[in-house]
Design a protein with these regions (language model features):
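Hydrophobic core segments within long, regular secondary-structure runs in both alpha-
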Residues: 5, 48-55
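Short alpha-helix boundary/capping elements
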Residues: 16-19, 30-37, 46-51, 62
């Protein structure tokens, strides 16, 4: 999971057309996030492997995986919010 999150953050920081969708994906999967999960948008805009990684995370949202994910993404939360409209 760490490699996927790091890759997605690099995509966001590249400031391309994919930055917004990747920032949205990362923020939406945080526990208690105010961002709405928009699977159809992600499916259309994101890389298939990254999309599947987020789906797997959703399936395991009540396990330790979600807390591991939160620890990885939380330090970037403020930065990611700048990319989401």
């Amino acid at each position: 999971m760490k490699n996927t999150v790091e890759k997605m953050i690099r995509i966001v920081r590249a400031d391309t057309g994919a930055s917004e969708v990747y920032a949205d994906m990362l923020l939406s999967m945080l526990p208690n996030s105010i961002h709405k999960v928009n699977i159809s948008y992600w499916n259309y805009k994101a890389d298939r492997d990254d999309f599947n990684a987020m789906l797997e995370l959703m399936k395991s949202s009540y396990t330790d995986a979600i807390w591991e994910y939160e620890k990885l993404v939380l330090p970037y939360k403020e930065e990611l919010q700048k990319y989401v409209k």
